[in-house]
Amino acid sequence: MLPSIAKHAASHQIHPLKKHGQNFIFDGSLCDKIVRASGLEENSNVLEIGPGTGGLTRSILHKNPKLLTVIETDERCIPLLNEIKQYHPNLNIIKQDALKLKLSDLNTNKITIISNLPYHIGTELVIRWLKESSLVASMTLMLQKEVVERICAKPSTKAYGRLSVICSLIATVEKCFDVAPTAFYPPPKVYSAIVKLTPLENIPNSDLISKVELITKMAFAGRRKMIKSSLKNLAPNISELLAKLNISDNCRAENLTPNDYLSLASLI
């Protein structure tokens, strides 16, 4: 039988390292709650980034996935994960930088992603995975609460921005629950939250999404400017294009809906 998560980490003398952005979870009940929020079914193909001391890994394995692939860059954690593998042969351990991973490299059908993501690469990974959404069944992720609020934000709110637009065009998003700093060791300075993203059946093509990325980058860079000013370098006839879409050129970036940005992208 495996020791508790904390004792297992201690037996390998694993302490959190700032360079890896590590904040460990030793509370098995919290890990179970995250997996329940994912709606994980048996015989799924699962991906976890940064398993660390294996708390979330254990909870995922208790749901009997077909295969759980974990990506870990910290070589100190590999022996600990190999000990978990002795009890769960469906655990596949890859020592690699998560930013170098392409989902297509995993050679599996629809992947369920469940991860406590390092804060410093979380947003970048979400965007990358959304661009490979045809390979994703769902993503249940722990991120900074502020990032989750941006993902879930609606138009005309303070948190609404590029991330909100892109996420809502590719997936349904659901904030599951908040996680206090005290749930981690060491406690981070901010709250975290769990968010679930499920790719839509009909997703705009990659060219359109790239255009939306460009348009929103320009629009939200001048967040308080009127949209006609923010996008004046996008197209010389921007006011005409906005009028064609019944969008007032006196609107600001935060007033346009994701579909407004998509429609504008289709005209550029």
Curated annotation (Swiss-Prot):
Record-linked Gene3D superfamilies: Ribosomal RNA adenine dimethylase-like, domain 2, Vaccinia Virus protein VP39
Superkingdom classification of source: Bacteria
Cysteine disulfide partners in this protein: none
Keyword S-adenosyl-L-methionine: yes
Catalytic activity: adenosine(1518)/adenosine(1519) in 16S rRNA + 4 S-adenosyl-L-methionine = N(6)-dimethyladenosine(1518)/N(6)-dimethyladenosine(1519) in 16S rRNA + 4 S-adenosyl-L-homocysteine + 4 H(+)
Database matches in SMART domains: rADc
CDD domains given in the database record: AdoMet_MTases
A single MF term (Gene Ontology): 16S rRNA (adenine(1518)-N(6)/adenine(1519)-N(6))-dimethyltransferase activity
Short name of one Pfam family: RrnaAD
Major enzyme class: transferase
Catalytic activity, EC: 2.1.1.182
Subcellular location: Cytoplasm
Alphabetical keyword list: Cytoplasm, Methyltransferase, RNA-binding, rRNA processing, S-adenosyl-L-methionine, Transferase
NCBIfam families per the UniProt record, alphabetical: ksgA
Function statement: Specifically dimethylates two adjacent adenosines (A1518 and A1519) in the loop of a conserved hairpin near the 3'-end of 16S rRNA in the 30S particle. May play a critical role in biogenesis of 30S subunits.
Family per record: Belongs to the class I-like SAM-binding methyltransferase superfamily. rRNA adenine N(6)-methyltransferase family. RsmA subfamily.
Descriptive protein name: Ribosomal RNA small subunit methyltransferase A
Organism of provenance: Rickettsia bellii (strain RML369-C)
Gene of this entry: rsmA
